[in-house]
Amino acid sequence: MDTQPIVLVITDSVTLHAAIVSWGLQNFQVKAEDLHVITQADRLEGKLNLKSSSLDAVVSISALHTQQWLLELARVLRPGGIIVLQNPNSVNDDVKETLSALERILLLAGFVLSEGADGSIDGLGPLAVKGRKPAWDTGSSFKLKKKVAQKPANVVTFDIPAFKVQLGDDLDDLIDEDSLLTEEDLKKPDLPPVDDCEVGKAGRKACKNCTCGRVEMEEKQEKLGLPSDLLDNPQSSCGSCGLGDAFRCSTCPYKGLPPFKLGEKISLSQSFLTADI
């Protein structure tokens, strides 16, 4: 019956120092027939002729650990198996940098970092890093525990008193809105008369039954003796005609009119158009 190795020590070198083999036997507490050694691993092209999950531990001694190589080591390791990476070219000056690089590549390959390896190997210096393959494997499954539904605790309820509003009792207290209006409020406002006189060729002209006040305005214009163009576009040679009678001369054509702005139509108020008694 073909038995698979339990511990594997693999290196790129042609030979392996006997101290490394002794360290592996002592550290992993295995028999000599259970520890296998592979040299010149760089010729394997990243593939091991081993079954998946067949090793308990792997010690890899190489100056260059690639991501592909670590994934292959992870394949042959059992869940929970130990992996030790060693860079034989490391010196005391760059130990920290080497450790950091090896730890990083271990994590990227899916391993979990473990405590640092103790002791040293003759001729190679201290072991670099020690990791462990997670205790689960691809395709593994486990049952999820369902939470038992708990009975709801006793809920204390309170009866909220309800208040009913009797609308019929307050109807007598309502105030009539019309009673708040006075006689002055009820009177219709005096709206300004609408100019509805006929429009002829010379402009608007008071009709026979004029109610808008145009008759009175025309009578006032005739009384003042001013043509319509002077009322529509008042002008002044002295500049004081629009200021009022106090500033007008005795011959001013606008004498008797209220103050106005030059160039703007003179608007006569209703009180001004009322005929003098």
UniProtKB/Swiss-Prot annotation:
Residues given in the record as [2Fe-2S] cluster binding sites: C197, C207, C210, C212
Keywords assigned: 2Fe-2S, 4Fe-4S, Cytoplasm, Iron, Iron-sulfur, Metal-binding, Mitochondrion
Binding site for [4Fe-4S] cluster: C238, C241, C249, C252
Cross-referenced SUPFAM superfamilies: S-adenosyl-L-methionine-dependent methyltransferases
Motif Cx2C motif 2 location, chain numbering: 249-252
Residue numbers spanned by region N-terminal SAM-like domain: 1-141
Places the protein is found: Cytoplasm; Mitochondrion intermembrane space
Chain positions covered by the region annotation Fe-S binding site B: 238-252
Region feature (Linker): 141-186
A GO CC annotation given for this chain: mitochondrial intermembrane space
Motif Cx2C motif 1 positions after renumbering to this chain: 238-241
Listed GO MF terms: 2 iron, 2 sulfur cluster binding; 4 iron, 4 sulfur cluster binding; electron transfer activity; metal ion binding
Positions of the UniProt region annotated as Fe-S binding site A: 197-212
Protein biosynthesis among keywords: no
GO biological process: iron-sulfur cluster assembly
Cofactor(s) listed in the protein's UniProt record: [2Fe-2S] cluster; [4Fe-4S] cluster
HAMAP family in UniProt: Anamorsin
Subunit note: Monomer.
Family: Belongs to the anamorsin family.
Function (record text): Component of the cytosolic iron-sulfur (Fe-S) protein assembly (CIA) machinery. Required for the maturation of extramitochondrial Fe-S proteins. Part of an electron transfer chain functioning in an early step of cytosolic Fe-S biogenesis, facilitating the de novo assembly of a [4Fe-4S] cluster on the cytosolic Fe-S scaffold complex. Electrons are transferred from NADPH via a FAD- and FMN-containing diflavin oxidoreductase.
Domain characteristics, as noted in the entry: The C-terminal domain binds 2 Fe-S clusters but is otherwise mostly in an intrinsically disordered conformation.
Name the record gives this protein: Anamorsin homolog 2
Source organism (scientific name): Picea sitchensis
